């Protein structure tokens, strides 16, 4: 079989187009092999730029790259939730996969709670694949990649990046390293908590209104940071109208990278640039104006007629 034409894949994806089904399968298989080599806590060196949820907002992802720099010029960590809710989950995920395939050391993709079979069947990605390809094969190839995505990244051994937050079952980074991640996200337990939990003004742990994960407070955050010699925890998972929000004496930051979320929230988005572990700079960006994006018709015409 001919080697993958990664340059072609990147070029197609950059135009907000999706790949022929067989090419997508090959790209997904290729990225799965790359992800197999990554640790549950993937080490990353500064300088690096950390990004939050994207949710299929392809044109805003392009704006993110205009704001932060293109791959491979900038080294990126994306903290999950690439798909669902936006119009272009398929094209967004394809673009990120193509970049990962071409420059694996310049882009780290973490798993969010939406990188799951169950959630994508409810919030849009499954239906989008069905509409655009006329079958569910593309969705199946992508969900295999979901299972392989790593859970956390560790910047210069001092900044932990994870989609959701902490777990009462996890005290040390080594406990994250031993999770069996190649599976659908479970309904409870450590793996589930890492992608579902939220920081909140609570004492230690509280029941989450999301029905998965926990609410965790300053005390457990400070303990976790202290035990693991961390400076900061970066996470996404929650809309922040100002784009980012520090909590718990600046031991934790939420980064949100989907501007005007769901095309109606009116929020600003951000990315967090780390020159080194002590030098961080949020970069803010707004949604691309409607005149610069293609709004799909209510019912997309199937690709193969």
Curated annotation (Swiss-Prot):
Record's function text: Catalytic subunit of protein phosphatase 6 (PP6). PP6 is a component of a signaling pathway regulating cell cycle progression in response to IL2 receptor stimulation. N-terminal domain restricts G1 to S phase progression in cancer cells, in part through control of cyclin D1. During mitosis, regulates spindle positioning. Down-regulates MAP3K7 kinase activation of the IL1 signaling pathway by dephosphorylation of MAP3K7. Also participates in the innate immune defense against viruses by desphosphorylating RIGI, an essential step that triggers RIG-I-mediated signaling activation.
Similarity comment: Belongs to the PPP phosphatase family. PP-6 (PP-V) subfamily.
InterPro entries the UniProt entry points to: Calcineurin-like_PHP_ApaH (IPR004843), Metallo-depent_PP-like (IPR029052), PPA2-like (IPR047129), Ser/Thr-sp_prot-phosphatase (IPR006186)
Designated name of the protein: Serine/threonine-protein phosphatase 6 catalytic subunit
Keywords: Acetylation, Cell cycle, Cytoplasm, Hydrolase, Immunity, Innate immunity, Manganese, Metal-binding, Mitochondrion, Protein phosphatase
Keyword Cell cycle among UniProt keywords: yes
Subunit comment: Protein phosphatase 6 (PP6) holoenzyme is proposed to be a heterotrimeric complex formed by the catalytic subunit, a SAPS domain-containing subunit (PP6R) and an ankyrin repeat-domain containing regulatory subunit (ARS). Interacts with subunits PPP6R1, PPP6R2 and PPP6R3. Interacts with subunit ANKRD28. Interacts with IGBP1. Interacts with MAP3K7. Interacts with NFKBIE. Interacts with TRIM14 and WRNIP1; these interactions positively regulate the RIG-I signaling pathway.
Organism, scientific name: Rattus norvegicus
Keyword Hydrolase: yes
């Amino acid at each position: 079989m001919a080697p993958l034409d990664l340059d072609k894949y990147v070029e197609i994806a950059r135009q907000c187009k999706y790949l022929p089904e067989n090419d997508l399968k090959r790209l997904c298989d290729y990225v799965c092999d790359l992800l197999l080599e990554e640790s549950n806590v993937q080490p990353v060196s500064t300088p690096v730029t950390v990004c939050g949820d994207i949710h299929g907002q392809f044109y805003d992802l392009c704006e993110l790259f205009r704001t932060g720099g293109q791959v491979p010029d900038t080294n990126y960590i994306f903290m999950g939730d690439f798909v669902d809710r936006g119009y272009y989950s398929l094209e967004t995920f394809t673009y990120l996969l193509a970049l990962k395939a071409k420059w694996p050391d310049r882009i780290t993709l973490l798993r969010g709670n939406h990188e799951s079979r169950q959630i994508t069947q409810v919030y849009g990605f499954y239906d989008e694949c069905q509409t655009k390809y006329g079958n569910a094969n593309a969705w199946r190839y992508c969900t295999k990649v979901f299972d392989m995505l790593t859970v956390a990244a560790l910047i210069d051994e001092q900044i932990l990046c994870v989609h959701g937050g902490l777990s009462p079952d996890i005290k040390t980074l080594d406990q994250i390293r031993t999770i069996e991640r190649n599976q659908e996200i479970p309904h409870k337990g450590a793996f589930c908590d890492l992608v579902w939990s939220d920081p909140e003004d609570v004492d230690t742990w509280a029941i989450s209104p999301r029905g998965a994960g926990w609410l965790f407070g300053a005390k457990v955050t400070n303990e976790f940071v202290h035990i693991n010699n961390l400076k900061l925890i970066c996470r996404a998972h929650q809309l922040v109208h100002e784009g980012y929000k520090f909590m718990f004496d600046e031991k934790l930051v939420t980064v949100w990278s989907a501007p005007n979320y769901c095309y109606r929230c009116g929020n600003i988005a951000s990315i967090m640039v780390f020159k080194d572990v002590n030098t961080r700079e949020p970069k803010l960006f707004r949604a691309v104006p409607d005149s610069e994006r293609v709004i799909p018709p209510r019912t997309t015409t199937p690709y193969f007629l």
